Every structure is written in C-alpha cells, then in structure tokens.
Design a protein with these regions (language model features):
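N-terminal active-site segment of His-dependent metallophosphoesterases
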Residues: 1-74
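Domain-start "cap" segments at the beginnings of catalytic or binding domains
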Residues: 1-30, 229, 235-260
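Short loop/turn motifs at secondary-structure junctions
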Residues: 4, 53, 133-136, 191, ...
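Amphipathic, non-transmembrane alpha-helical secondary structure
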Residues: 39, 43-50, 75-78, 152-156, ...
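Conserved residues at the C-terminal ends of beta-strands
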Residues: 60, 198, 296
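Accessory, non-catalytic peripheral segments of nucleic-acid enzymes
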Residues: 249-365
Length: 365
C-alpha cells in the first residue's frame, strides 16, 4: 500500500503572451484585464493548490511565451512560486519549446521547493510527504526550441518507485513534429502510472490506463481556444487509484455564440436578441467574455449579413460602450453562415432545372 497524496497538473502558462484576434481599445478597464490575464490565471492555479492543500504542483512546460522572457513575467512567476512554497507545496517543472533551457533568464532566486528537470537526460526526483516517499517523478526538459527526438523512449520506470509520474512537453500529432514527437504506445511502454504532459492547449485525457493527460493551457489566447481553460487537481489514493477534477483558471473566456436569423426581419431585432443572450452568458461564466458571433439560417437579414458594412454595423452596435465595463462581453468577430430564402412558388415557375426540381416535390406535399 502506498501513500495518499494529491497534486495540481498544469502546463502552457504563456505568461505575458498578448491576446490574438482582438484589438484593444485605448481606454477602459479591459486593457488592464487582458494584459494581466495570463498572470491572474497562474495565480488561480496556486490558489487552487493552496485551497486543496496539495502536495505538489507539476508544470509541464511553456511557462513563458518565447526565448526572451520579460523580467516582469519572471518576477511574477517567482512571486507565485514563493507563495506556493509558503504553503508547503513542492514545484516540479520541465521546460518546453517556448521556454527552453538555453533561453535567457534573470538571476532571480527561486524557493528550494522548486525542482527543474535538466535537458541532458531523464532524471527522477522523489515526492516526499510526512517524511516518506509518496511518488517518484521523472522528467526531461527542452534544451532548445526544437526537439525532434522522441524523448518518451528515454523514460524507464525503476523498481520500487511507488507511484510513478512522467513529465514531458510533447506533440503526439506525428513523427515529423519538432516538439518531441511520440505515440501513446511510447508513453505506455515507460511504465508510468500518470503522464503529466504539456504542449497541446486543449485539455485531453488520452488514456486512463495509465493516465496520459494534457491539461490544456491555463488561459485562452485566441479564437482557436474556445471555452474553459485551467488545470487538473489529481488525487492519488493509497492503492494508486487516480481521480481527476478540472479546475477553471481562465479570467477571460473566449466563446462562440450561434444565432439563427430565421425569426428576425429587422437588424434591430437581431441585435436585441444577441444582447439578451450576452447578458445570460456573463451570468453563466461569471467572467469577461470575448465572443465570436456565428449567424446561421435564412431570412431577410441574409442580405445585411452578407455585406461587410452590414456586419460591421452589427458589431459596432453590440460593442458600443462595452469596453468600459469590468465584466465585458466583447464581440470580436461576426461570421456569416446564412443563406438566402427560397420561395418554392417562384422557383417552380422557372423553365430550367432550377424550377423542375421543386415541381417534382409537389407529389410529397
């Protein structure tokens, strides 16, 4: 029988990375909110770790957003590590493609509770609890931005290691990837009980035997990253049973909203309906939202939506003064997927094949 313990698994913090797909205004509270979003998300990771009294936080790569990490981002990261350390939480980290080992770093001292895996070989570090080994954590970092080798094949579990955790920043998408490509079979062959992966920004549990988990990123950054973002709280029982709980950490959420235009004949009616749904969305998520509005269906508004001027007018009407709200819901894009209405009676009168098809449908009416 082993020892019960728990940890937070997060990855891809991308501290300081600016949002894409949105133009920030020159004034209003949202400028500051967007600028601090990635930092606030990591604060919420540490909050969750402290509130749940976990034994460790595992960070599986890409703490920063590039080889040259800003000093402010490094100081903010160190500040949160010290906060976790004060709560008795151990930190285990591997470097990824956005924060490789050779990247510049300021000489900022980190707590003794921070363990960073080297890039030269897979190493193991015990996770201690109450003076006893609760688990063994294996990991390897990126030395450079691109790693074409299959690093998963370098992991080998040792005997008597208790619960074994592997940490790797990897792309399971294909052998030609420059981001430590591997397969699920490669990971399973290492004999780990839990794989704490990073690199993929959408959370995904690849396997439950053993657990192979991507937590996704902690804060959405663009329209490609729709929906809740966060980390996993992982509870490991005395007999090695694993329980996952997803914890939302994003402070601003990217969302899709789909509207069928069939019920509306006037632009003002559509704007009113969207505004009403926006209010419900704010209440549902409890945080600011950046929204892609997708219009579908058919009706009189198809002509408005099919023109760029029409779409711009709707967006401007929806966003008027919204940037001055703390709990904003900003429509960043309007996608027209509507179609023109079809009048079957008129079509039947056409002499060509366009009219013959609806004529043939009369027998079903």
């Amino acid at each position: 029988m082993g020892k019960h313990f728990s940890f937070i698994h997060c990855a891809d913090l991308h501290l300081g990375e600016p949002f894409r797909d949105i133009r920030m205004g020159s004034s209003g509270p949202w400028n500051e909110q967007i600028g601090k979003a990635t930092f606030k998300a990591f604060e919420k990771v540490v909050d969750a770790a402290l509130e749940n009294r976990v034994d460790a936080i595992l960070i599986s790569g890409d703490v920063y957003n590039g080889d040259h990490h800003s000093l402010s981002a490094q100081m903010a990261f160190a500040r949160e590590l010290y906060r976790a350390a004060q709560g008795g939480i151990e930190i285990f980290m591997v470097h990824g493609n956005h924060d490789p080992g050779e990247a510049w770093r300021a000489d900022i001292p980190l707590p003794e509770t921070v363990h960073i895996f080297p890039a030269d070989q897979v190493t193991s570090i015990p996770l201690m609890k109450d003076g006893e080994k609760a688990a063994t954590i294996y990991g390897i970092s990126y030395k450079t931005r691109h790693v074409k080798e299959n690093l998963a094949k370098e992991f080998h579990r040792e005997k008597d290691d208790g619960f074994a955790i592997g940490m790797l920043h990897t792309d399971m998408g294909g052998a030609d990837s420059p981001y430590a490509p591997c397969t699920a079979d490669d990971l399973k062959a290492a004999g780990m009980d839990y794989w704490a992966l990073g690199h993929v920004h959408t959370r995904k549990t690849v396997s439950t035997s053993p657990y192979i988990v991507y937590p996704g990123n902690t804060q959405g950054l663009s329209l490609r990253e729709i929906g809740p973002r966060g980390c996993y709280l992982v509870d490991v029982g005395a007999y090695g049973t694993v329980t996952l709980k997803f914890i939302e950490t994003d402070t601003i959420r990217w969302m899709d909203m789909t509207m069928d235009i069939s019920a509306y004949s006037q632009t003002e009616e559509l704007i009113s309906a969207v505004t009403k749904r926006r209010s419900g969305l704010k209440e549902l998520t409890g945080r600011p939202n950046i929204i892609r509005l997708v219009c579908t269906g058919s009706g009189p508004l198809h002509a408005v939506l099919s023109s760029e001027d029409g779409r711009d007018f709707i967006l401007q009407s929806l966003n008027d003064k919204e940037q001055f709200r703390y709990l904003f819901a900003w429509f960043v894009r309007l996608e027209d997927r509507t179609r023109t209405s079809i009048d079957l009676k008129e079509r039947r009168e056409l002499p060509d094949v366009t009219g013959k098809f609806p004529q043939s449908l009369r027998c079903f009416e």
